[in-house]
Design a protein with these regions (language model features):
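A short glycine-rich, Lys/Arg-flanked "PGG" loop and its adjoining helix->strand segment in the class I
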Residues: 141-152
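Core SAM-dependent methyltransferase catalytic element
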Residues: 197-198, 205-217
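Conserved class I S-adenosyl-L-methionine
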Residues: 5, 9-56, 72, 157-183
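Class I SAM-dependent methyltransferase SAM/SAH-binding core
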Residues: 64, 70-117
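A conserved beta-strand element that flanks and buttresses the S-adenosyl-L-methionine
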Residues: 128
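Short catalytic micro-motifs in class I SAM-dependent methyltransferases
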Residues: 131-132
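Short alpha-helix
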Residues: 181-196
Length: 217
């Protein structure tokens, strides 16, 4: 492989922080958009189920849903007959809406916490980060913390229902670039997963979907 191409690939596969994000700005952005979040959400069932299949979410699983927002993924977990869901989000307004939507389910609970730092007391079968990864200021700290929150043999999955370029363009269109580091390459995320002790890494990154999933050894 030519040296110049190796350098290009190396740059693409190395994570660098694009923005020094202020978590208060992240909270403010999602608080402001919480009331219109569901009406602006377009869900593609085929993509959602592909993501859930890769994450191996199935009957009886306990699921930790990171940056759950208003609970976009929770109906899909319910359809798969999971045993427990804990939704976590840094936005209190998002959490308030999610709690109201799913208050009749006693196996679903919500926490307004910072997932990069929160000490999870329970270990889950599956951990999901859907449509949120670029909004975490320290993704390495996030994955390291989530790896502690998953059982041995369980999965941690980062997924988006858009490709990297499409997501960057979307963030620009909704004035969210300031609170986004951009979606890093699947290879760079694989290295972060490995450094957190996750193995058997699955990667898929196309123009319209992005999935990286690993198993806790």
């Amino acid at each position: 492989m030519p040296h110049s191409l190796r350098q290009t690939l190396s740059r693409q596969d190395t994570f660098t922080v694009r923005n020094k994000m202020d978590k208060n700005e992240v909270i403010s952005f999602f608080d402001i958009h919480s009331t219109t979040w569901d009406e602006n959400m377009e869900k593609d069932d085929s993509k959602m189920n592909e993501i859930l299949d890769v994450a191996k979410i199935s009957s009886g699983n306990s699921v930790l849903d990171i940056a759950c927002g208003t609970g976009v993924m929770i109906d899909y977990y319910i359809e798969r007959n999971v045993s427990k869901v804990t939704g976590v989000d840094i936005s209190s307004k998002m959490i308030e809406i999610a709690r109201n939507k799913f208050k009749k389910y006693d196996f679903i609970d919500f926490l307004c916490e910072d997932a990069e730092e929160f000490n999870f007391k329970y270990q889950y079968d599956r951990v999901m980060v859907f449509n949120a990864f670029p909004h975490f200021p320290n993704p390495k700290a996030l994955i390291k913390n989530l790896a502690k929150a998953v059982k041995s043999g369980g999965t941690v999955t980062v997924a988006h229902d858009r490709g990297r370029k499409d997501l960057d363009n979307h963030h620009k269109s909704v004035q969210a670039s300031k609170i986004s580091n951009g979606l890093i390459s699947e290879n760079a995320l694989e290295e972060i997963f490995k450094s957190a002790g996750l193995v058997d890494i699955y990667k898929k990154a196309t123009e319209d979907i992005y999935i990286v999933s690993g198993v806790k050894a």
